[in-house]
């Protein structure tokens, strides 16, 4: 098992957000965490990444306990996080933004080179000398993902990657997920675009009010109209 999340309880101040949340991901899987706005999807990713550490429970990555570690240490272990708000350095060029991701390796070699990134996201090559702040929302999303890849993660956490993007950009992100899936990269995806999620994931969890209400394969979820209607408003 690549990632094991076991009965974590996460709080924002005194507010209890996640209740005994458990999930697991095998190497090479694409797993989607579904749920309405405010259900606890993003908090789950923040908990895994150490950005909002749970009070109780356990999080193991490749068999090692990571709960309580600083987020940069978790990243160095091989977990990459792409947040929903597409954080980039707007005053740095696209190239320099990517270089920030590469420098996080601390001298280790990455299978993700500039050439490979530019092949995957050609628009970043076209704008490599432009400030990141000049990019559109979709281009910033590509840059955020690409910069994370430069750190050579084995597990990629994607938080609402299609939110607010044009259909053409969503198609490019779909192609990207297929590429990294074929290469055996593991992905945990939080997504409200149900059509996108069901097309590209292997398994799904549904979270509602901070509680995991369902888990199963995509085929099983597709057949379960009651669950989709109850928790996903389908």
What are these regions (language model features)?
Residues 34-36:
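The feature captures the beta-strand-to-loop junction immediately N-terminal to the Walker
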Residues 49:
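Helix-to-loop junction immediately C-terminal to a conserved catalytic motif
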Residues 13, 54, 92-112, 120-125, ...:
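ABC-type ATPase nucleotide-binding domains, specifically the catalytic core motifs of the NBD
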Residues 148-149:
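ABC ATPase C-loop
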Residues 156-160:
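Catalytic Walker B motif of ABC-type/P-loop ATPase nucleotide-binding domains
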Residues 131-135:
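Conserved ABC ATPase signature
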Residues 57-66, 77, 110-114:
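Conserved ABC transporter NBD signature motif
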């Amino acid at each position: 098992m690549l990632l094991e999340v076991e009965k974590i309880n996460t709080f924002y101040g005194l507010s209890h957000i996640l209740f005994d949340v458990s999930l697991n991901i095998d190497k090479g899987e694409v797993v989607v965490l579904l749920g309405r706005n405010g259900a606890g999807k993003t908090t789950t990713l923040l908990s895994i990444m150490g950005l909002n550490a749970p009070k109780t429970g356990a999080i193991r990555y490749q068999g090692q306990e990571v709960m309580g570690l600083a987020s940069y240490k978790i990243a160095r272990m091989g977990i990459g996080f792409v947040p929903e708000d597409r954080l980039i350095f707007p005053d740095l060029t696209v190239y320099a933004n990517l270089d920030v991701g590469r420098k996080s390796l601390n001298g280790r070699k990455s299978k993700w080179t500039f050439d490979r990134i530019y092949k995957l996201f050609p628009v970043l090559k076209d704008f490599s000398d432009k400030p990141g702040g000049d990019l559109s929302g979709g281009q910033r999303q590509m840059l955020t993902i690409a910069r994370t890849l430069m750190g050579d993660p084995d597990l990629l956490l994607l938080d609402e990657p299609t939110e607010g993007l044009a259909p053409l950009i969503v198609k490019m992100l779909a192609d990207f997920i297929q590429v990294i899936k074929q290469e055996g990269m593991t992905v945990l995806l939080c997504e409200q675009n149900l059509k996108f999620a069901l097309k590209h994931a292997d398994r799904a969890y549904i979270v509602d009010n901070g509680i995991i209400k369902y888990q199963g394969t995509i085929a099983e979820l597709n057949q379960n109209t009651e669950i989709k209607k109850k928790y996903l408003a389908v």
